[in-house]
């Protein structure tokens, strides 16, 4: 299996206290660069006589670049090349809506959502651009995450960032 991670952007709708993105350039990958990366992976797989490609979409917040992700997935489907492809995405989940949900289900994505704990713990670090916590917004998306799990049989994975100000609560997540 070839594991290809595509950073579709360096943009985010949050300003998490521990994040490095403040120092980034707020750019988005072009379709052509994503296509070149996929083409490279396909060539590599052929040389290795392998036929499994996993593409991980990350950011910033990758769902900000949903159109790019859709275009790159469509490209992979178009070239096919007798390659089995799996897709994953790591997201803060705040931009998830019905359209994105349908796309993730139709393309058999695995989904990882960032959540640092209960409301108090999560909202210490994961804040929006207005300085507000994001826990409540994410919880409003629970019905979409539940629908994803029911339709795919795949669990939503949780990405938990342990920092100096939440490490004592880590056992509450487990």
Named regions from a protein language model:
Residues 8, 59-60:
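Short acidic donor-binding/metal-coordinating loop in glycosyltransferase active sites
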């Amino acid at each position: 299996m070839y594991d290809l991670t595509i950073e579709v952007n360096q943009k985010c709708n949050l300003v998490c206290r521990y994040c490095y993105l403040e120092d980034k350039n707020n750019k988005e990958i072009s379709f052509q660069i994503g296509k070149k990366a996929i083409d490279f992976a396909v060539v590599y797989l052929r040389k290795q006589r392998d036929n499994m490609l996993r593409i991980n979409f990350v950011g910033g917040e990758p769902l900000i670049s949903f159109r790019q992700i859709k275009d790159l997935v469509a490209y992979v489907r178009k070239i096919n090349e007798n390659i089995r492809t799996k897709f994953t995405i790591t997201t803060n989940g705040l931009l998830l809506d019905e359209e994105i949900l349908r796309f993730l289900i139709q393309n058999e994505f695995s989904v990882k959502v960032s959540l640092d704990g209960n409301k108090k713990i999560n909202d210490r670090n994961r804040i929006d651009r207005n300085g507000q916590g994001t826990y409540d917004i994410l919880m409003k998306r629970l019905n979409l995450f539940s629908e994803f799990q029911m339709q795919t049989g795949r669990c939503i994975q949780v990405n938990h960032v342990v920092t100096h100000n939440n490490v004592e609560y880590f056992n509450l997540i487990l």
